[in-house]
Amino acid sequence: MTSPKATAPDVTASDVTVGARARILCISGPNLQLLGTREPDVYGRDTLADIHARLEQRARALGVEVDARQSNHEGTIVDWIGDAPREGVAGILINPGAYTHTSIAILDAVRATGLPCVEVHLSNPDAREAFRRRSYVAKACVARVAGFGADSYDLGLDGLVRVLARRSGAS
């Protein structure tokens, strides 16, 4: 038995409209600056810069803007999330890295914004060690995309843009 190739339907700006160039905050958490060299058998060979460049291309195709950031520091991530509404952010795409399994502070920050948030992971945490199977952050998210490697970011963005379009009544 072969496994089906997982692909999302192609989404274009004509399929989804979210108003005046919605701004998406993309946050990548601890150790993700090491992508490309850190456990490539688990996380792939794409660097975070590669992922961000593709995400920006995808965002342009969807008619949105992405502000992609990375930090190893929980407090910085919490500050970015907390500032998001005042900065005109419409939604959040987040790969909390190891904070997925530990950070009630990030969970609370996402909840406090009231913004739609999609959690993304390169690997599938549910297929890994038991301690990786709990996500505190996902409890505040509209969806979770995992296990598609670097494509998880693009798939998460596609989903988030669809959520924003539905909420604006434009889809």
Question: Where do the PLM segments sit?
Answer:
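Intrinsically disordered, low-complexity terminal tails and inter-domain linkers enriched
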Residues: M1-A20, G169-A170
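Short glycine-rich anion-binding loops that position phosphate/pyrophosphate groups of nucleotides
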Residues: P30-L32, G97-T100, S123-P125
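Glycine- and acidic-residue-enriched helix-capping/strand-helix junction motifs
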Residues: L35-D50
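Short beta-strand elements in bilobed, periplasmic/extracellular small-molecule ligand-binding domains
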Residues: I51-H52, E56-R69
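Short, glycine-/small-residue-rich phosphate/pyrophosphate-handling segment
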Residues: A68, V118, A127-S171
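N-terminal small/polar loop signature for handling phosphorylated ligands or for N-terminal nucleophile
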Residues: Q70-I94, A98-G114
